């Protein structure tokens, strides 16, 4: 199946400049098996697998799927918690010439109905049960709706009685096939083109609750992963750890995509518990962990001094806003730098901080542009380039971007222009060669003709000792057009007044017109889907309704 967006000119450019290669992710697993064969590759609570063993199991799974006559480029859905076999299934799909879609364990029939139908998936890989939910029953029901979903592979060692026809134990199939010769020619015949074939699908978070699907060949993903290996300084001496689900970017970018390129080991925490996470870091001497901000908050509630975390080198936090205050507390408690970066599933990776960058750069910026990315800063209203040093809407193009939305050329064309330029919608400025995020173009507040960037106010308020998190939004006003409201979650439920907020911001020398004119102290923020990102559209509607009611 061919990608829908790349032109021959783009392909030639990225190949000529060395950003795209003819490599697949499997090639790095094969190299690691050859050069680091006895070194551990994957670890969970049940299995410890070396690179040599991992390659053998991957080949066995892939060859089994080929022998089952699953057609090349068929779609296969992998829904698993963090596990060794979850990783093996993902790379085996690529090896067998299949297109994998790895999804979060918490997705249920509503979301999966869309995905199974949209992808015409022929197989799924799941646990029978997990966290008191029966996945096999759910997919049995989906099979009744979609006859093309012919096969179910279980991570369990046994197939339960009464399972639908076409249900297999993946672990037993893999172990049996690993004892027999593999037809290498049959697998080579299924090799995907790293540029010309879709290899994997990813999901986006959205306000509708139904994720969109994004298609990727391996070339841009490998390009980004090599960039991450460089800025994180990953080597085959590192031990990465998935605390967040490997299906998402927070942990998946670090552990599934980047670690094998470096030859680094990956340890998996199957189910999050703050004590268990810290204990596993100590036990496995993890050097890098992938988390979402909520994980850090909960880990800070534990006495970290009970654990030896001296091995930890850096923390990759993504998938939601991490306040500077929480970042400071986490770095102090865990003794590791927290990195920041910019990217989306829809548009690809833009930039990133190096682990050794100063605290100010890691807190306040999203780092330098990744190799090969080109950037333009345009005026929000005129679309003309802004003067050097001035803020503008970020537009970029480069070798890190996906092919587009799966089987949706029309939607893809609304995000990428014919030459590959796209925008995250962020208003940014360049300083010290780094991107400083000032806010989203759609979130910028225009008060009496003056621009107010929410991120600037949020960054200042997050330094207040009573503030745990803050979101700044605009609301309609007849006189000024818009005014500013600060939504605040106070630390420990402390009282926090409007007067305290204003005095604090005045002390920070904030211009008078930027001072919020309303304060709403709340217990939590609405989120965009399951991403953990603050849904500012909901907050805007809420405050606009309050103002209209005269509250």
Predicted regions and their residues:
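Structural core segment of the AMP-binding/adenylate-forming
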Residues: 68, 98-172, 492-494
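AMP-binding/adenylate-forming catalytic core of the ANL superfamily
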Residues: 107-117, 124-126, 289, 398, ...
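Conserved pre-ATP/AMP-binding loop-to-beta segment of ANL
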Residues: 37, 153, 168-203, 210, ...
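Gly/Ser/Thr-rich phosphate-binding loop
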Residues: 172, 261, 286-291, 300-361, ...
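Conserved AMP-binding/adenylate-forming
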Residues: 21, 47, 62-112, 117, ...
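AMP-binding/adenylate-forming catalytic domain of the ANL superfamily
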Residues: 154-155, 510-533
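Conserved AMP-binding/adenylation subdomain of ANL enzymes
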Residues: 222-239, 247-288, 302
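Conserved AMP-binding A3 loop
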Residues: 50-53, 190-191, 199-223
């Amino acid at each position: 199946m061919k990608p829908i967006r790349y032109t021959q000119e783009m392909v030639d450019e990225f190949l000529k400049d060395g950003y795209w290669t003819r490599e697949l992710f499997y090639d790095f697993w094969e190299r690691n098996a050859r050069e680091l064969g006895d070194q551990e590759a994957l670890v969970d609570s049940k299995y410890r697998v070396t690179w040599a063993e991992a390659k053998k199991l991957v080949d066995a799974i892939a060859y089994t799927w080929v022998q089952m006559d699953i057609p090349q480029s068929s779609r296969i859905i992998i829904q698993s918690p963090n596990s060794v076999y979850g990783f093996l299934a993902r790379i085996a799909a690529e090896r067998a010439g299949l297109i994998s879609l790895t999804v979060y364990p918490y997705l249920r029939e509503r979301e999966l109905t869309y995905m199974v139908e949209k992808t015409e998936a022929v197989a799924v890989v799941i646990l029978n049960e997990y966290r008191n939910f029966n996945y096999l029953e759910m997919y049995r029901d989906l099979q009744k709706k979609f006859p093309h979903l012919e096969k179910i592979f279980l991570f369990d060692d046994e197939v339960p009685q009464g399972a639908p026809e076409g249900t297999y134990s993946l672990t037993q199939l893999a172990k049996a096939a690993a004892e027999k010769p593999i037809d290498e020619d049959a697998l080579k015949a299924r090799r995907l083109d790293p540029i010309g074939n879709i290899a994997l699908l990813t999901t986006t978070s959205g306000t509708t609750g139904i994720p969109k699907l994004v298609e990727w060949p391996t070339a841009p993903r490998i390009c980004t992963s090599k960039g991450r290996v460089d800025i994180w300084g990953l080597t085959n001496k590192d031990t990465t750890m998935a605390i967040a689900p490997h299906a998402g970017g927070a942990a998946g970018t670090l552990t599934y995509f980047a670690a094998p390129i470096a030859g680094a080991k990956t340890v998996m925490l199957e189910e999050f518990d703050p004590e268990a996470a810290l204990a596993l870091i100590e036990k496995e001497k993890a050097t890098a962990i992938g988390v979402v901000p909520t994980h850090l908050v909960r880990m800070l509630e534990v006495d970290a001094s009970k654990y030896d975390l001296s091995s930890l080198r850096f923390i990759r936090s993504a998938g939601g806003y991490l306040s500077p205050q929480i970042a400071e507390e986490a770095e102090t408690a865990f003794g590791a730098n927290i990195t920041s970066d910019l990217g989306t599933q829809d548009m690809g990776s833009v930039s990133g901080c190096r682990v050794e960058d100063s605290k100010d750069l890691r807190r306040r910026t999203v780092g330098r542009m990744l190799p090969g990315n080109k950037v333009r800063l345009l005026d929000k209203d005129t679309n003309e380039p802004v003067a050097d040093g001035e803020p503008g809407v970020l537009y970029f193009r480069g070798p890190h971007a996906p092919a587009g939305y799966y089987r949706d050329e029309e939607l893809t064309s609304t995000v990428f222009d014919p030459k590959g330029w796209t925008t995250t919608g962020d208003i940014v400025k360049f300083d010290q060669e780094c991107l400083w995020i000032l806010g989203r173009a759609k979130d910028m507040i225009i008060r009496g003709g003056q621009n107010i960037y929410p991120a600037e106010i949020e960054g200042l308020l997050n330094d207040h000792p009573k503030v745990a998190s803050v979101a700044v939004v605009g609301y309609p006003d007849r006189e000024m057009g818009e005014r500013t409201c600060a939504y605040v979650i106070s630390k420990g439920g402390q009282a926090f007044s409007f007067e305290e907020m204003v005095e604090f911001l005045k002390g920070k020398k904030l211009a008078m017109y930027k001072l919020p004119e309303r304060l709403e102290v709340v217990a939590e923020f609405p989120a965009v889907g399951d991403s953990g990102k603050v849904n500012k559209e909901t907050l805007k509607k809420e405050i606009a309704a309050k103002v209209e009611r005269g509250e």
